[in-house]
Amino acid sequence: MAKKKIHIENSVRRLRFNNDEMTQEQLADLVGISRQTVVAIEKYKYTPSLELAFKIAIAFNKEIQEVFFINQ
């Protein structure tokens, strides 16, 4: 049986702009990652660890499922 890959999407870019147009650098500093990692997350090229996903959600004062979700 072939495993179906789960595609996780996110609303990080939208949340940054809705949060006083937070820069990628500001978010990176808040959660302890590089700006390049923020770019990769926003472009769906990198799926963050569960711990990092929670840190990002907390940075926006959101529940994790409001930031990261499965698109089927």
Predicted regions and their residues:
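A detector for short, charged/polar N-terminal pre-domain segments
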Residues: 1-7
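Short, charged recognition helix plus adjacent turn
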Residues: 2, 68-72
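Short basic helix-loop element that most often maps to the first helix and adjoining turn
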Residues: 11-30
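Residues in the helix-turn-helix
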Residues: 26, 37, 66
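Recognition helix of helix-turn-helix/homeodomain-like DNA-binding domains
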Residues: 33-47
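DNA major-groove recognition helix of helix-turn-helix/homeodomain DNA-binding modules
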Residues: 51-66
